[in-house]
């Protein structure tokens, strides 16, 4: 009988191992990539297809909330009109496990023709994408945590972690502070802690008011009724 606790722990271990493994792949291309993104006068366009597209969307959210303007472009939609999103000064970050999908093969020549710098966050450094990119971030994994070694599990975790490494380095490089973070999150706890005043938290007509000589039982009722 399968021990499902051990199986779940094994999945987590495999994904953790995948992240540890890609530490050794961090090189000068990573450093050049963060400088390229920071110094760009445009935005960071993050693209991918399949599970890579989902990871790309999460990374865009992280970049935007931490001071790096970014937009998501689905690779399949891009080759059917969404390429108009890309402006001359934009940097493209392309996520792909294989680096050889048909959509990527169509997109890359467009990026090169337009002069957009291309960063490949890719699981196959011998792929078309890796060979054509300006900078290559290797996030290859030995196997997926999926029991069939098919569904993106370890590979998507590695993509996410490496993307977070990019974002975190950019945070430090830009000197992005908790106050900056709060400005982008007025609805979050940190934003409220730094910027919301007591007067913002109640409606004027719901403010408890009593006279100096109001009996204590009435004071308690007034406060309790308008919390």
Regions from the PLM with identified roles:
Residues 1-10, 49-57:
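Short, compositionally biased "basic patch" segments
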Residues 9-14, 59, 63, 192-203:
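Short, basic/glycine-rich phosphate-binding loops at helix/coil junctions
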Residues 29-33, 78-82, 125, 218-219:
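Short acidic active-site motifs
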Residues 42-171:
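Glycine-rich phosphate-binding loops that contact phosphosugars or nucleotide phosphates
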Residues 131, 145, 172-204:
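Internal, active-site/partner-interface "lid" segment
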Residues 192-225:
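Bateman/CBS regulatory modules and CBS-like beta-alpha motifs in cytosolic regions of diverse proteins
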